[in-house]
Amino acid sequence: MEIDELTALGGLLHDIGKPVQRAGLYSGDHSTQGARFLRDLAENTGRAEYELLSLFSEFHHKGHMKNDELMIRRIKELSPERFGLTMEDVLNALWIVYEADNLASGEREEGQPQASRPLYSVFNPGKAYPWAELDFEKELPVPGDVFSIRSQDYRELVKRLWEELSKAKLRSDRLLPVLEKYLTFVSSVTSEGNIISLYDHMRMTSAIALAMLRAGCTAEDVRSGRCRKEKRFLLIEGDFSGIQDFIYRVSGKGTLKYLRARSAYLELIGWDVVLEILSRLGLTRANVVFNAGGHFMIIAQNTPDAVKELEEIRAKAVEWLYREFESDLYLAIEWEPVSGREFGREGGKNLFAEARKRLKHKLTVRKLKRFGEIKGLFEHGHTERLAECPVCGRELPEGKLEPSASDPETKVCPTCNRLVSLGGNLPKLLGFGRTAKNDAGVLVEGPFSGFVPYLQGGRPVGEQILVKNTLNPGEIPESAQFVPYFVADYFKKDPKGGVATFEELSMASTGTRRLGVMKGDVDRLGEFFSSMDSPSKLATASRFMDYFFKGYIGAIIEGKFGYIIGDVPSLRDWPEEPDIVVVYAGGDDFFIVGAWDQIFELAFRVRRAFNAYTGGKLTLSVGLGYFDERTPIYRMADVVSERLDTAKDEGRNRVFVVGRSRPLDGKHKLSYEWNHYEELWRTYAPRIYAGNGRLKGKLESKKGLLWKLLEIRELYVRDPNDVRWAYLTAYLLGRHGLSDLFPELVGIDTKAVERKEPQPVYWVDGVLKIVLMAVRR
């Protein structure tokens, strides 16, 4: 066993005693019980390494570290030489993990610890979770009034953990998913209101410990405080820009497959860069604080060699991106030296947030110098005749275009051709093998590696195997690194099992034949993340956020969690196989297409689920659009992006439901606050809409009346001070004997006038237009 492996694994397992103690399996504090658990595991499995790792549980608190004689005696008893280690190696590793434990969360048992206390929500610390395995196929983890976790729940947890640790290969890449599965909903400490998942604390301890080791820290450095005071660490951040242009600026046949392929390809490019950084700097996946939405952060060592490697990685990645996509897609990579103390708070200051703020400034400056890493960027590069790729619009030498894999009569660029194949394979993929670019079977390439599809029934190849939507390594070779990655990949199947087309989705609509498009993201997320005051808190928050969109969106689309979501605005019974395709969902945003009426309803389903998931503390804004299926996707993306921006600008926590007009002064809002729209729907829809594309009662033969109401609303929009609209509404409804349908629209709402708010007639179009689309024949 190498010293770096010992340190990384020691960090991962140092707090294993916490669930063991709460299960009441042994006696003593959690350090003692964790050590006994690992020693028993070693004896039961015959893996002596677990006995060596038990030292990291036994010696990771200040009181234990003072007893040098005991520590040295315990190390000698285990004969570190048989593991290829020296006494000094193990002693240094123990002190490093001890310090990393302190730095990872700044957490210690404060107040009155209580073993049964649950993990509180990072979004709403007033609510907590029951213990459960992390399983996206089961329940949506909703925080609530949970006051304790039963010891029998912990016993069941420890039993399952024992079983999997007994079988898992003793390597960071294999232990991380086991710990994530069972310790995500376990509190790292049992003091009141703790929001840090034990899994995230343990992996951040491992990350910081390995970075300390790589930075040359020793036991003496820890004792003297040098590793805490000196800038021995790097916070590395990468952020893609131009994502929307990269994904949506495509056209031609099979556009939806292209979109999904480009979204998946972007994910692979990001992983290629992240894994290259980890490989060259000698780190593990635990060092990745987050990697979501084209944005990643890594904790590393601050050494000249590490900085040199990062400079080379950045230059090569940016040059490759420019060569492949010209200026469409850019990756800014920066790093900030930090000391150990800057992983937390000090004197009331959030030093961790301040360090991240400095890093963010560096990233902003680098984005302003976009592609400045490339020498000779503006030198004339082509003398040959140029031709345009009909899919992505890039210009490149005519001779480099090649017959499309899906339509040999059309010539496309090599990248789009590979993405045609990727799009066709995505429904069958279990993941990808990361390997050398010139290896057989490479389908797409990143800046540093090639990716070979891992198909059902096939054998994965590559040094690292990225496996989709599972924490189980399955059949991948033991020699390969296991990289679980999660992706929201729900799609409506066409008759051949592939991805449905825009035409097929729009044809499944109720009423008018339209394609619905939804774009949304989380409000004020930057403010939320800026409050995080430790790597472990940031890791917990970003992981929980990312998993809502990558892990649970698919289940929401499938109609699950109805008991949480409740009744939402709906035009038809929710289908068993919704006519919806997720183009992208992850990080804090999503872009989804489908039958327009299902997309309309899905927006409210997602919002309700997200509200429950975050304990009611965070909000979403969404822009909706309904288009002819022949509309270019980039135009659809532009429209819903503008509508999302409008919802944000008008106060956030809002939905732009449908295109609307407003008075020229621009003071009236175009979007709706979610609760307001749901209230309007509950008020008006049951009076006029029978469901599944039919109007109610006598309105079935008087559809024109609803159109007339929309015309009257336009009178109000032209001049809100002119009251003719009120008289015309009263006359119209009275003439048809329907005044009881819209009593709110008859007359002038004086309270709205006093509050300087629009009259009810201004808001009614958001319901009427949707209903009229649903009943159109």
Swiss-Prot record:
Gene designation per UniProt: csm1
GGDEF domain location: 513-660
One matching Pfam family: Csm1_B
Molecular function per GO: ATP binding; endonuclease activity; exonuclease activity; identical protein binding; transferase activity
Taxonomy of the source species: Archaea, Methanobacteriati, Methanobacteriota, Thermococci, Thermococcales
Subunit: Probably part of the Csm effector complex, that includes Cas10, Csm2, Csm3, Csm4, Csm5 and mature crRNA. Will form a homodimer in solution, interacts with Csm4, which is a tighter, better association than the homodimeric Cas10 and uses the same interface for interaction.
InterPro entries according to UniProt: Cas10-Cmr2_palm2, Cas10/Csm1, Cas10/Csm1_subtype-III-A, Csm1_B, GGDEF_dom, HD_domain, Rev_trsase/Diguanyl_cyclase
Protein name: CRISPR system single-strand-specific deoxyribonuclease Cas10/Csm1 (subtype III-A)
UniProt family annotation: Belongs to the CRISPR-associated Cas10/Csm1 family.
Summary of the function given for this chain in its UniProt record: CRISPR (clustered regularly interspaced short palindromic repeat) is an adaptive immune system that provides protection against mobile genetic elements (viruses, transposable elements and conjugative plasmids). CRISPR clusters contain spacers, sequences complementary to antecedent mobile elements, and target invading nucleic acids. CRISPR clusters are transcribed and processed into CRISPR RNA (crRNA).
Other facts: Encoded in a type III-A CRISPR locus.
Cofactors that this protein relies on: a divalent metal cation
UniProt note: domains: The N-terminal HD domain has ssDNase activity. The C-terminal GGDEF domain has the cOA synthesis activity.
Keyword check for ATP-binding: yes
Keywords: Antiviral defense, ATP-binding, Endonuclease, Exonuclease, Hydrolase, Nuclease, Nucleotide-binding, Transferase
Ranges where the HD domain occurs: 1-106
Enzyme Commission number(s): 3.1.-.-, 2.7.7.-
Mechanisms controlling activity: ssDNase activity is inhibited by EDTA.
